[in-house]
């Protein structure tokens, strides 16, 4: 890690590390480099920001994010103890909702998600995506949130970049039969562009 600030502000993609319970990365802001550590516990995300100075990490602020309806509510406490509360949310623009001619396919949805918020982190963006994506549980969905983090982290790309303003989604719902039982499969593909040439993530869910 370096404390030197590049010309471009945002997240250093090569610094992103994802484990079962955490996501860590370096983010460049106007006043320098920060090490960000986000811990996931159920539907609660704790984001700690450390200013990198002369090779040392100095804790500067903490954001605790949780779910409230379709929004992510973030409560930030800075080094002086001042508290600020704001929301992060995903806004869906639905393009089409068309039926497939294939007998097993029920529906194909195409839509985009725009991320809106004062300070959007990788983990809070991931949580916002789970709240507005079709067929994804919004409570007790720790594993889903982790998968969303991978999608958003993949969207950052090489070098230093900000989180994407939009994600474009194709979601297919299909019905299958196995051993006399019917189950449904939900396939979601996430893209960076409206032409859907840059695939960055895929989720599959099965439900009886």
Which residues does each PLM region occupy?
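Transmembrane alpha-helical hairpins and terminal membrane-anchor modules
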Residues: 151-167
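N-terminal propeptides/leader regions of secreted preproproteins
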Residues: 1-113
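Hydrophobic alpha-helical transmembrane segments
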Residues: 142-154
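Extended non-catalytic interaction/regulatory regions in multidomain proteins
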Residues: 2-9, 133-145
């Amino acid at each position: 890690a370096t404390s030197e600030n590049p010309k471009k502000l945002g997240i250093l993609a090569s610094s992103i590390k994802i484990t079962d319970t955490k996501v860590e990365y370096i983010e460049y802001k106007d006043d320098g480099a920060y090490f960000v550590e986000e811990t996931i516990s159920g539907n609660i995300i704790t984001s700690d920001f450390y200013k990198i100075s002369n090779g040392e990490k100095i804790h500067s602020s903490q954001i605790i994010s949780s779910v409230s309806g379709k929004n992510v509510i973030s409560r930030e406490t800075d080094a002086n103890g001042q508290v600020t509360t704001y929301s992060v949310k995903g806004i869906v623009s639905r393009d089409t909702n068309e039926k497939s001619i294939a007998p097993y396919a029920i529906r194909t949805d195409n839509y985009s998600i725009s991320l809106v918020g004062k300070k959007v982190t990788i983990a809070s963006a991931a949580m916002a995506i789970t709240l507005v994506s079709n067929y994804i549980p919004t409570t007790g969905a720790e594993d889903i949130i982790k998968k969303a983090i991978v999608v958003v982290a993949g969207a950052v790309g090489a070098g230093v970049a900000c989180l994407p303003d939009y994600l474009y989604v194709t979601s297919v719902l299909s019905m299958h039969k196995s051993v006399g039982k019917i189950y449904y499969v939900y396939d979601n593909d996430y893209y960076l562009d409206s032409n859907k040439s840059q695939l960055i993530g895929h989720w599959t869910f099965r439900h009886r």
